[in-house]
Amino acid sequence: MKVINATSYSDLSRKAANIISAQVILKPNSVLGLATGSTPIGTYKQLIEWYNKGDIDFSSTISVNLDEYVGLEPTNEQSYRYFMTENLFRHINIPQENTHVPSGLANDMEAECQNYDALITNLGGIDLQLLGIGHNGHIGFNEPDDAFEKTTHIVSLGESTIKANARFFEDINEVPTKAITMGIKSIMQAKKVLLIANGPDKKDIIEKALYGPVTPSVPASILQLHPDLTVICCFE
């Protein structure tokens, strides 16, 4: 485990983007596992800036996203497909057919979970997985006490997660209560993992995740066992 302390959010974003860009430059057809939420936005902005300067080419890159709300159309402004399009995909030259986000609208959600796992396997696995961390230690939408051995599955969102996401909706009652997410097992199978955390409110959970016991009550704690984990954090 490598822990990097950033001096600011912009420094965190540059450092994270540098790791991602190095992965793409060294292996243009890399499979990137991508995350949503407020923390990765600066990282994506930095990647877009470097792309516009001609420093990085995404034309052969493949992306797989961690999760999606159940019941939201891809065109819904709160869907994670929409988030990725607006914050990254439409600003770079990654082919749309190379971008994968699980569907929250599939008629058979269990089949969608199995198909998403098969997709990742057929792509040869994830080369670099980007992660944020929730206040309760969730990664993806793997809530506390979810089994570590799960692959892609449907989850009922915890109260703290719903409250945290309510700021993106006009009313807390509009926040979806279920999501499809890559499981802990799926995440741990990535060749490299990059965890980013920003803000003083993330300090306690990062300490629990990285230095506390490995337990399903803190989902991110399993990352202690990953053979190639980099953590970039800024608690300012």
UniProtKB/Swiss-Prot annotation:
* Record keyword Hydrolase present: yes
Molecular-function GO terms, alphabetical: glucosamine-6-phosphate deaminase activity; identical protein binding
Catalysed reactions, semicolon-separated = alpha-D-glucosamine 6-phosphate + H2O = beta-D-fructose 6-phosphate + NH4(+)
Residue stretches spanning the membrane? none
Listed GO biological process terms: carbohydrate metabolic process; glucosamine catabolic process; N-acetylglucosamine catabolic process; N-acetylneuraminate catabolic process
Q: Which PANTHER family match?
A: GLUCOSAMINE-6-PHOSPHATE ISOMERASE
Q: What is this protein called?
A: Glucosamine-6-phosphate deaminase
Q: What is the protein's species of origin?
A: Lachnoclostridium phytofermentans (strain ATCC 700394 / DSM 18823 / ISDg)
Phylogenetic lineage: Bacteria, Bacillati, Bacillota, Clostridia, Lachnospirales
